[in-house]
Amino acid sequence: MIASYLGTVFGSASAPAFARSPGRALRPALALAALALLAGCASAPKTVPLDTSITAQGQNSRVRYIMLHYTAGDTARSLKVLSQGQVSSHYLITDDRVPKAYRLVDETRNAWHAGDGSWYGQSWLNTSSIGIEIVNMGPIGTQWQPYSDAQVSLLIRLIREIAARHDVKPQHIIGHSDASPQRKTDPGPAFPWQKLAQAGIGRWYDVNTVAQFSASLAQTGLPDVLWFQRELARVGYAVPQHGQLDRATINVLAAFQMHYRPARYDGQPDIETAAILSALE
C-alpha cells in the first residue's frame, strides 16, 4: 500500500521526463512533507508525560466506610449479578469449604452496592465506601443462615487489610442495614459482629459498662423515645427526632439491635438497648 502510494506520488521510474506535467515537479516535495508529518505523529506520546517524583502531603483516601452485605443467593448467581448487572461490590466472599475472595471492582473506583442510605449524616455512600458481599442466603423462613467460621476468618483478614490501607475507623465498619435501616436487613442478626470486634475490627461495647448502665436504668426507669432517637443519631444512624415511636424509628432500633443485641431485635426500646447505646462511643 505504501509502495503504491509513493509510486502514485513520484510516478513511474520508466516514464520519460517530457511526458510529465509541470505540477508533477512538486510531488516529491509534497511526499516528503507527508512522510515527515506521519513520522511526527507516530513518535508523539499517546498520553501526557507526567513527572510523579513529588507527592503532595495534603491528601487522603476517598474511602471512609466498609459496608458488609449478604448476597441472598449462591456463589454462581451472586457472581453473575454482581459482575453483569446494575449492582456490584468491590469484593465477594464465597461459601465454599475453603472460601475464596473475588475482587470485582478496584478500590479506586465506585461499586454500586450501598444505594440510598446515610451514616453519620453522609449520604451517597457508594462514593466513599468499600462494599463486601458474603455468600449467604439471609432469612430462610423464620431462621437466618449462619456464616461459616472459614468465611468469617477470611473476612476478618480482608477487612483488616482494607481498613489499614484507607485508615477506616472502627465505627465506620458497618452493615447495609445500619446505613439503610428502612429497606435493608443485611448482613442480618446471624452475622457475628462481636467476633469481629474480638479480632479488633469494628465498634463494640464494654460489657461491664453496659451492666453498670443497666443497673442504673433499672432504678431511674426507661428513657423516653426522643432520648433513644438522639442516641441513635449520635452513634451514626439516620433517625427521626420527633419523640414518636413511629415505624421509621422502630426500623432503626431493630437495625441497631441486629448489630449489637441480635438475640432480640423487635425494634422496641428497652433497658438493655438503652444501656448499650450509652456504652457506645
Can you name each region flagged by the protein language model?
Residues 2-30:
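Bacterial N-terminal signal peptides that target proteins for export
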Residues 39-40:
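C-terminal motif of bacterial Sec signal peptides marking the signal peptidase cleavage site
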Residues 216-280:
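Short acidic, glycine/serine/threonine-rich helix-capping segments at coil-helix boundaries
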Residues 44-59, 64-169:
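Active-site-adjacent loop/helix surface patches within enzyme catalytic domains
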Residues 79, 118-119, 138-150, 180-183, ...:
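Second-shell loop/turn segments in exported
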Residues 168-183:
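Acidic/histidine-rich, metal-coordinating catalytic segments
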Residues 82, 94, 107, 135, ...:
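Structured segments of extracytoplasmic/periplasmic soluble domains
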Residues 58, 92, 189-212:
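Acidic, His- and aromatic-enriched active-site or binding-groove loops in soluble protein domains
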